[in-house]
């Protein structure tokens, strides 16, 4: 088993040990529940408060993890737990307490929004055959989080998630209520229409059929053409 397999195996083992805890998986591992799996450096989870974070910390510390010092953000606190495997190859969990702070935009999203927009789904890895059921942020809410942040990694994830989104008007409304949707969409559009984007995407996700690539691209572009009212979309969306 190579180091990447060891990392995924350890993440899955730890998540199995955390099955009784009240948490929502976000980030790269959440993407794997809706799209072709990719490697992720760490596992990000959201909890509602410090008591649950403490309980999760006890499980991780008892499983060989160490708690690292983390900076205070001024909004939502987070705790990082790391474990060294295979000659200092590190596995890490980030526990976000009370919500999510996007450092790129200073947008803060509360944990209750994350929990309200989550569902129990089957989680899968990139290199292992293991499967587990876990509470994961739903695909539309994950798309919102990724679009607000809009880093290169997020844009690649957005591209892969796009064919699975359920309510584009709701997504537009949630993004627009927190930042400039048109600015975010412009950044996404510029990236996915660049000549180098497909090669970069395949470097992360593996070989993609051209038809699959074009389907995702079409889904992203359709989001920019959606003319539904963001305010009405936010009010009317069915929660899962």
Please give the residue ranges for each predicted region:
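Compositionally biased terminal segments of proteins
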Residues: 1-240
